[in-house]
Amino acid sequence: MPRKTLIFGNGLGMALDPRHFSLTNAMAEVWNDPFAISDVHKDLISQCLGGNGAIPQREDQLDPLHLVISACRTLSSINMSQRMNVHWLSQEGQHFPVAVGNYIHKVATRLHMYGGSLPQAFLEPLIGFVRHTKSHVATLNYDKLLYGAFLDAGLMAGYFHTTLVDGMVGNGFSSQALERLYNNTFGYYLHLHGSPLFFDHHGLARKRDRHELNPFSPEGSDHIVLTHVRHKRSVIGASMVLSAYWNYLNFSLNESEEIIVFGYSGDDEHLNDVIAAHGQSKHIVIVEWDGLDQTEQQRLWYWSQKFKSNNFHLWRLPNVLTFTQWDHVY
């Protein structure tokens, strides 16, 4: 059976536990954790969001925050390159990008650390399909729902005799570990928006084991995408890991017979552009929750605008976790 590419959004987690997997809830709970971020940095972040005690609740609020971080990094680099005795920034300003990075990392960590699991009635046909076809899997969310289940099922078992690889090896991330050599035919597991398991160590991106991640893990990283949609491309471009994943997304879509988009809002224009580029020649299957208070015609029009194509099939379900038609031919 030919390969497909399966792209999973946050609707996967929301179908299981909407309270835990709500980004708004995660951002608020980390903000209110007295050990997650200092009061000084909270004040600075609030000022970026408009002042008056404003707190981050949505990705689209993070536009000015990203601009301030970029400015701080630029001024710090000028100071370092010219060996100035006086810094452009205060101590708080110098530490601000790190503090925000740690906050974002802790939000992703909270979403990742979930004690439940996907129902077996959903997982078993999905795992069986991926194992049989070596179809590619790409995730936009930070949780371990699929990643943990795939590891436990033995789908990601090293370079040889494996179903999927993500480029993370013992010494850290290597794009060479994504190359198919020695007649390998594996598929790809692409963390498109990163993972809180990723951290930088002596200039190399590495990945923790699942049991090593906890709410007090200190390291933020540049390998998590949590920002206003207009800045997501630049965050991806600044990370060697994420850039490689997006390059391989194009490769994966190119060799796939079909694209299945599961639990995705349609809000990430950088992803929509990639799907649209392949959607003229590939059939797209969209699986979404039917509780959006819109008619089927409205949703068909919505997706045709997002993917610049009418070559798609739309599944609208009361519970997306009842979907098992991974191998269906349209």
Model segments located where?
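SIR2/sirtuin-family catalytic core signature
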Residues: 1-16, 25, 30, 38-51, ...
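Flexible internal linker/loop segments at domain or repeat junctions
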Residues: 203-250
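A short alpha->loop->secondary-structure connector
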Residues: 153-168, 263
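A Trp-anchored, charged/polar loop motif used as the substrate-binding/catalytic surface
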Residues: 116-120, 170-177, 239-248
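A recognition module on extended beta-rich or small alphabeta surfaces enriched in W/G with H and D/E
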Residues: 178-210
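A short secondary-structure junction signal
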Residues: 148-151, 200-209, 271-273
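A structural signal for short, well-ordered beta-strand segments and their strand-loop junctions
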Residues: 5-9, 136-141, 158-161, 188-193, ...
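Gly/serine-rich nucleotide phosphate-binding loop at the start of the catalytic core
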Residues: 1-135, 140-148
